[in-house]
Design a protein with these regions (language model features):
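Predominantly extracellular beta-rich ligand-binding scaffolds that present long acidic/polar faces
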Residues: 1-194
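C-terminal outer-membrane/trafficking sorting elements
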Residues: 198-227
């Protein structure tokens, strides 16, 4: 939509490219390349305060063009920072399909955070790694994280896969604090889920003990009391 591609910077503190406060409203599709995104295709750098309202459809074309589709950045590598971006377009792809980010390549193992972003568009895939915010990361577990992001769009895949979630599409992506899943959305396999002790006062005949997540924070229950 805005930038076709850039590759630079092998440290998370190095951003030789910055895309800031840009808007795309045009529809996108790719039949040959790395896939479509409203703001940047194959990209290394920072993306801040950008908005996409265009629809992306990469369900036709070569196998390569069907791999990465997203509302903001389709395929990221090396130093990547996505902050304060919003997608409201419908995102339709095959594999590595995300409302904000399609895939983070292995790169040099730099830590990356997708933060303060919102997806309001539907996200549809046909294979593995489909998510409302970040679909996939090839880096070591936890090096890529999603924090303070909101997904309000329905996420679906026509393929049989457990790699699908309202926030992330792979367990290699860590979930930080402040993430929100919109009311009424279907729970998906990779969503943060409580252990079933949501209401410690409802079970009056037994003592509740355990640990669960609430709004991205760990809650400890001991003898029916939350800590």
């Amino acid at each position: 939509g805005i930038c076709g591609g850039s590759q630079s910077g092998k440290s998370i503190t190095t951003y030789n490219y910055l895309i800031e406060s840009c808007t795309n409203s045009g529809n996108l599709s790719t039949t040959n390349g790395v896939g479509s995104a409203g703001i940047a295709g194959s990209y290394s750098g920072a993306v801040k305060s950008c908005t996409n309202s265009g629809n992306a459809d990469d369900t036709k074309g070569t196998a390569k063009s069907k791999q990465y589709t997203a509302g903001i950045v389709s395929c990221a590598s090396f130093a990547v920072d996505i902050d304060g971006c919003t997608n409201s377009g419908s995102i339709n792809g095959v594999k590595n399909v995300g409302g904000i980010l399609g895939n983070v390549m292995k790169g040099d193992g730099a830590a990356t955070t997708i933060k303060n972003c919102t997806n309001n568009g539907t996200v549809s895939g046909q294979d593995l790694y489909v998510a409302g915010i970040a679909a996939n990361s090839a880096r070591a577990d936890g090096l890529v994280s999603v924090a303070s992001c909101t997904n309000n769009g329905e996420v679906t895949s026509t393929g049989t896969t457990e790699f699908i979630g309202n926030l992330r599409g792979n367990t290699t992506i860590a979930l930080g604090e402040g993430n929100v899943i919109g009311a009424g959305l279907k729970a998906l396999p990779l969503d943060p889920a409580p252990t079933g002790i949501n209401n410690v006062n409802a079970n009056t005949n037994r003592t509740a003990n355990g640990v669960f997540l609430r709004n991205g924070k760990i809650v400890i229950v001991k003898n029916n009391k939350e800590y």
